[in-house]
């Protein structure tokens, strides 16, 4: 070995010795891999239904100012949104707290102490009052003030990894806030259209009750004239009672829905007054392909992804803990036994300190922390994989339900048209004087009941379409 290569080798020897003396890092189980959905999710929907992804404010497509106002109130004042916002602020504060450890620190300190020296202790000579020797004991009033600086050198990237982990948590919390936003908007929209469905059903039931009352009045008149017996009107009376019971049930459901909307929108001070509007027409939409796009458009998947990224950075920080810590410290102070001497130039003291902490034997603490970090990371990855599978299943299930209900609505529309034709024929026969008016009412009641069934199916389709919008991410985009 020549002299030029000998000295660099000698210079690197302390570093090699330092690294060799670190606590050994044992091997752990292999990390899990993240799952991605298939390139295309087959939802078996007709091409005509595949019109694209939902918009971030998908509820505006209903063109209903009342619904928009309810959702805006919920997003602004709902307790769930407040909790999500505070979780983000907490994560940001924690990230800032970790980031402050990565830079230099500078402190100013000052103290004053009045003390009596012991003549029998280590500082015994200072207990004497001998001005010639520089002692004026036994009482002293000493003071110190000055600056102290420190810097923890993040050579192995431990602090940087911890900062990255915290920032990943911040991004995950932000995605969770968006998920809360979409869930809240979806819940308000579903309740709102359920209320509108019940309100429309209430109108139809009132029409049925009106027709039943017409039949009952006619039957009573015929009975009073001795044309029919009392038994013939019993069935109509029973049906009218059932209709009244259905009206009471609908009114109760509407009150429950209003109470739930009040809770979601934090609208507790006064009662919620909703106006009835027509239900939207049945129409479905779904993008042609999902695949990787679903990962970027589902806020819950993004939150799970960022938790995984955060956990991987936590592993890096746990690995960096096996290497030495290096700290630099410096101080510039004034220190004197007597306050009168505190501001003299001779009372000045200064120094620089370089410290090194080398983990050699820790009873397995560092390896245990590393095992915990890896286990938490594997748990985050497993949770992410589970969320991916559930997200794809949610889309497939919701899309299938939307398609099924759309087909049912089409069949129901045909049934309603046929029922109206029967009513038209009865009305024509009445106009020709061939049947009584009560027979027209008898023809209208089945048509109205089919209309009630159609409203329920339309409301079910609305609910399913909102669930499909949520399954597609509700307009969220990374």
Swiss-Prot record:
This is Multidrug resistance outer membrane protein MdtQ. It comes from Escherichia coli O6:H1 (strain CFT073 / ATCC 700928 / UPEC). The keyword Transmembrane applies. A lipid is attached at residue 22 (N-palmitoyl cysteine). GO terms for biological process: response to antibiotic. A lipid is attached at residue 22 (S-diacylglycerol cysteine). Residues 1-21 form the signal peptide. Could be involved in resistance to puromycin, acriflavine and tetraphenylarsonium chloride. Coiled coil: none annotated. The lineage of its organism: Bacteria, Pseudomonadati, Pseudomonadota, Gammaproteobacteria, Enterobacterales. It is found in: Cell outer membrane.
